[in-house]
Amino acid sequence: MIDSIRSSRALIDVRRLGTVDYRAAWQQQRDLADARVAGGPDTLLLLQHPAVYTAGRRTEPHERPLDGTPVVDTDRGGKITWHGPGQLVGYPIIGLAEPLDVVDYVRRLEEALIKVCADLGLDTVRVPGRSGVWVPGDAGRPDRKVAAIGVRVSRATTLHGFALNCDCDLGAFSAIVPCGISDAGVTSLTAELRRPVAVDDVVTSVADLVCDALDGVLPVREHSPGARVASAM
């Protein structure tokens, strides 16, 4: 049985926007959310941002850049992160079906990105208690986040979304405590696969799989580190 999380059966309007200033994209999200509440379509924005730090509602003062670099405070969940060139950002503006299940929504975004990584040859997992998509730690290296997720739901409509590190500058994360997690690392598809993986290489797959996950065509499965070990035995 296909189990969509969306309240609409119409196709999602996927828009590839190139590079967009963060504040401009945030305003576009709010405009689209207003339109969705008024009966407009579900929309998925796919884009990159010029380099910027953004802080979710739970960001602590000590997690901000120590050098005073400006930070855009947002109304999404989560803590501080970085966006910039080489990172694919997705903002689904989706009307959720009742009863609302935000955890299920986040799991569906994770499922899509886990499948994107798997199709490229990268094994990724969920980490209990932490959102996003992770490369499990090994050989003395910690778990490493390759995709971050931070969302907001208002009037049964989603805003903000996910960021998949493709070939971005990982050094930008060194000035902050990414997502408030000090005992794990940040990585990219390029770093893990040891070959160039650009945003353009994954944007079509991300668009298709996010839509499939939200519509229930791609079901949510178990991807914990424990399940990974068990399946390898």
Curated annotation (Swiss-Prot):
Basic and acidic residues biased stretches: 57-66
Primary localization: cytoplasm
Matching Pfam families: LplA-B_cat
Catalysed transformations (reactions): octanoyl-[ACP] + L-lysyl-[protein] = N(6)-octanoyl-L-lysyl-[protein] + holo-[ACP] + H(+)
Residues annotated as domain BPL/LPL catalytic: 38-218
Site (Lowers pKa of active site Cys): K145
Name recorded for this polypeptide: Octanoyltransferase
Upper lineage: Bacteria, Bacillati, Actinomycetota, Actinomycetes, Mycobacteriales
